Amino acid sequence: MATTLEIIQDALDRLCIARRPSTLDVTDDTQRQMLALLNETGQDLCLAFQWQALTVPVVTPAADDNNNLSDQGEVATLCPGLSRFVDDCLYLNGRMMPLIGPVDVQGRTFLRAGGMSVLYGFFVEQGHLWITSPTTSEQELRFAYISKNWARDSQGSGIDRLTQETDVPLLDARLLTLGTVWRWLSRNGLPYQQEFLNYDNALRVLQAADTPRGIISASGPHTYNPRRSLLGGVARPWA
């Protein structure tokens, strides 16, 4: 995987700008701007797509909480570096459908009042994850989330911003380079349309390659939908 310095040097080469010293020097205006634009590119990519490299699966015991709203604990502990939850991917053992959410105040009130009690909902409030039903520690909470930490430092710790030349992004280095190049041209008032098209094309190709393929249905043209299938695997004709 390419380091921060290697990506910046690649971007300088593409722009026909002389490379700076072999170390990252943030007192140099060009390198400082390149670093800022590289971070902007990485952070935008993190928010724009559900990258598999940033997807974190979690399996943890549910909390012992008999209240209608059960507190599962601090989100910062359950999901270090949380950017957002993966849609339709929060399950409680013993229930065949994913928990609905994050639900708004109206939805919470509806579920707590007994409306469609077969469904559980979840929401985040005051830094805690809540489920709209009692839970026990015998149950397991299973979900996945997207991490905001799109890079690693030299110690292997997740980070959401590059600061050192040895930091390593988890996203595609070429895509980050192309994103940095078109942003640099734009910021400096230079034509950037072709470089943006190059970036956008690379982004689409990588998104297509990174998207898991759907499950083939043996029951006709029905698409697989975990919310509508009784058994995870083959979509049912009545789904």
Which sequence ranges carry the predicted segments?
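Glycine-enriched, solvent-exposed interface loops adjoining structured elements
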Residues: 1-239
